[in-house]
Amino acid sequence: MKNLKINNRFTAELPADPDLTNETRQVKNTAFSYVNPTKPSNPKLIHASEETAALVGISKEEIHSEEFLNVFSGKEILPETQPYAMCYAGHQFGNWAGQLGDGRAINLTEVENNNTFYTLQLKGAGKTPYSRTADGLAVLRSSIREYLCAEAMYHLGVPTTRSLSLILSGDQVLRDILYNGNPAYEKGAVVCRVAPSFIRFGSFEMLAARNELKNLKQFVEYTIKHYFPEITGEPKEQYLQFFKKVADTTREMILHWQRVGFVHGVMNTDNMSVHGITIDYGPYGWLENYDPNWTPNTTDSQNKRYRFGNQPQVAHWNLYQLANAIYPLINETEGLEKILESFMDDFILDYKEMFLNKLGLFTSTETDNDLIDNLEAVLQLTETDMTIFFRNLSSVKKTDSVEKAIEKIQFAFYKIEEVSGEILDAWKKWFSVYLDRLNAEVLSDEVRLQKMNLINPKYVLRNYMAQLAIDAADKEDYSLVNELYTLLQKPYDEQPEYQKWFAKRPDWATSKVGCSMLSCSS
């Protein structure tokens, strides 16, 4: 990979852990620890993203080289690089968890391509000083989910990390998939993921909690210098501008999640990026039947903190924790509080506009809030598939009758027999108002359909789809991984050759582990 432009500015400019032993411990006064990946016994490339490779300066030919396989499986280390694991803390499910860090992520290096910097990180490449009681490895199951999801999210237009490669390690990894005392061996795998950086809210929380204010200042200023060079002014003003940027990009990310029906599942502060990109794809899922109270994470099944409808509020809460972390550099609350107060106000306005656009409405009226609220209510009267409903809504014409409009979206109903009586009346009432509202718009049906189909995806990575790919891959059949990767590169296109994936969750998936129930086990 001769054209890779290596850059080690993170390790050159931030304090390193002087202890080079790879033993689990509390690591203080540092941003990272040097650590080498665990060498896999028999790596095998399952898939690589040519798009992501091109981003970082790797050619199509190099993807299939032995060097690519060895470097991105952790078997070899790139010349002139020193891999490292980052130190950070976080709030998990609302509670302070203390030191966390890269427990099974190892950063290989940064590279520069076309005046943009990217960090290359292996997930599942072995133990680090932050692994606690874990082995630092990952299984094929979770690696396929992460690999496919990051690329699917990118093509949906959602800010995200990217996936470069998915490699089988050749080793067996012991996991208890539901944490119920039934561990079993699974195939090991390594994913290489790519981002501007993997700096998290928790990176600053760790330093603030330990009162390492010199290091905190150094880390914040490093982040501003390299990733927010447009920020200028006095130091305190720079810190506020930085916080505002993070708040704005976080708000935009959450808006996209709500637009496509994505539920992250583990919105801990250590899983929040300062770049406003989606990171750490664990027990995620897409809404199938529209249910704001749904979370895919079994760990959160009781309190549902990270449920779909609560993601904006959690993002807001997480930003409060980031504000608390950088407060010692500012020593004034007013500026931070102002940014935090405007977050939800701005989100509510943006959410309304986004939702109206999903409905094909590009002007605003006084009754729009009622239209949105009433739809969110009627969608829950009987199980209604979110993705299919909004996609098929684009085919409704201004001249359609209420009955015709309902007929066009009825494929979204999981139990069509329930759509009668009061439920049918509620749908008729909503569509009557919606059709009137459509007729107040100036866009033609054809133009509106095109615009709606660029907002409402036809294809998303439903959990049952990922599980089918996992089941096949477990038998060394990677054709579904390839097919889903190709399908999800164009989620807004009709792709009639893949029409079978434009389907509601099958009955068998309602109670299958990996489809309806997911844990953090990976």
From Swiss-Prot:
It comes from the Bacteria. The active site is at residue 270. Its cofactor is Mg(2+); Mn(2+). Keywords: ATP-binding, Magnesium, Manganese, Metal-binding, Nucleotide-binding, Nucleotidyltransferase, Transferase. It holds the Pfam family SelO. One of its GO terms (molecular function) is magnesium ion binding. ATP binds at residues 101, 103-104, 123, 135-136, 193, 200, 280. It catalyses: L-seryl-[protein] + ATP = 3-O-(5'-adenylyl)-L-seryl-[protein] + diphosphate; L-threonyl-[protein] + ATP = 3-O-(5'-adenylyl)-L-threonyl-[protein] + diphosphate; L-tyrosyl-[protein] + ATP = O-(5'-adenylyl)-L-tyrosyl-[protein] + diphosphate; L-histidyl-[protein] + UTP = N(tele)-(5'-uridylyl)-L-histidyl-[protein] + diphosphate. Its EC number is 2.7.7.-, 2.7.7.108. Mg(2+) binds at residues 271, 280. Nucleotidyltransferase involved in the post-translational modification of proteins. It can catalyze the addition of adenosine monophosphate (AMP) or uridine monophosphate (UMP) to a protein, resulting in modifications known as AMPylation and UMPylation. PANTHER family: PROTEIN ADENYLYLTRANSFERASE SELO, MITOCHONDRIAL. Belongs to the SELO family. This is Protein nucleotidyltransferase YdiU. It comes from Flavobacterium johnsoniae (strain ATCC 17061 / DSM 2064 / JCM 8514 / BCRC 14874 / CCUG 350202 / NBRC 14942 / NCIMB 11054 / UW101). The lineage of its organism: Bacteria, Pseudomonadati, Bacteroidota, Flavobacteriia, Flavobacteriales.
